[in-house]
A protein has these predicted regions:
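A general structural signal for well-ordered alpha-helical segments in protein cores
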Residues: 28, 60, 64, 89, ...
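Short secondary-structure transition/capping segments
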Residues: 55-58, 91, 116-119, 147-149, ...
Length: 295
């Protein structure tokens, strides 16, 4: 399915594991079917929430292959192919494109970082090498570097770079991006708690962690807001805002996987260095799930 600058809720999928740490493909199938049945508008696999940094390249490819096979064109599948090594990013991007991905999510180069020209070329050379749409991923809290507004503005002119997942949480930055991009460049919230503020400045929706827990509601909030029923969207957003925030009470994806296990979805453990939540935070999260009617 073509990725046509989707307006809606794209779930940032978790990767379920068995207790021995191997990928649980049976549960992954169940989770994908649950998302599609709930109306999710798109699937992102191998994002931050999918724990790709702790998986081998072979495991990454097996998750991509399985996801594309199960989804079977019912909604677009975006794959995180980013790396802090441009050559590695190129290799993965071409591989996932050839496997049938509909779009690619490219993170800014973490740890080694880059100057503005290096940042531009990191994304542009990858976009030059593939024919499926590419989205930028700005998450400076993880990478230690932000994609500057001038670099985003320049990259937005590339015919194969179609949007950005903005996960800095900085509304001033987001507004500057919204001001400099054209109507064909999509701005997605990468933070569930500010999805509505971003849509109010022209955002296309959210790439969501919360959608792992409440996929139908996440889809409905975005659909209502973009469809003109802003009052209902805001009411539901505020109703579940505490849960959205508590899904980040510890580093993602620890809370969301913990929540899904509490809900009986059997997604298994995280891989080290991620580990179980503190008892105090488990109690807070359980209370939020109960308040939301999920337990």
């Amino acid at each position: 399915m073509k990725f046509e600058n989707i307006k809606g809720s794209i779930v940032a999928m978790i990767t379920p594991f068995h207790e021995d740490g191997s990928v649980n493909f049976e549960v992954l199938t169940e989770l994908l079917e649950r998302q599609i049945a709930a109306g999710t508008d798109g699937i992102l696999t191998l994002g931050t929430t999918g724990e790709y940094p702790t998986m081998s390249h072979e495991e990454d490819a097996s998750v991509v292959e399985h996801t594309i096979k199960v989804v079977n064109g019912r909604v677009p599948v975006m794959v995180g192919s980013g790396s802090n090594c441009t050559a590695t990013q190129l290799e993965k991007s071409i591989q996932y494109q050839d496997m049938g991905a509909d779009a690619l999510l490219l993170i800014s180069p973490y740890y080694n970082k880059a100057n503005p020209e290096g940042m531009y070329r990191h994304f542009a050379e990858t976009a030059d090498a593939v024919h499926i749409p590419c989205l930028l991923y700005n998450v400076p809290g993880r990478t230690g570097c932000s994609i500057s507004v001038p670099v985003v503005e320049k990259l937005a002119k590339h015919p194969n770079i179609v949007g950005i997942k903005e996960a800095s949480g900085d509304m001033s930055y987001a507004m500057k991006i919204a001001h400099c991009i054209g109507p064909d460049f999509a701005l997605y919230s990468g933070n569930d708690d500010i999805t509505i503020p971003l849509m109010s400045i022209g955002g296309s929706g959210v790439i969501s962690v919360y959608a792992n827990v409440m996929p139908g509601m996440c889809h409905q909030i975005v659909a209502d807001y973009l469809g003109g029923n802003q009052a209902q969207a805001v009411a539901n957003h505020l109703k579940y805002l505490k849960l959205m925030n508590d899904l980040f009470i510890e580093v993602n994806p620890i809370p969301v996987k913990s929540a899904m296990n509490m809900m009986g979805l059997n997604v298994g453990p995280m891989r080290l260095p991620l580990c179980e939540m503190s008892e105090e935070h488990q109690a807070v999260l359980r209370a939020s799930l109960q308040e939301a009617g999920l337990l």
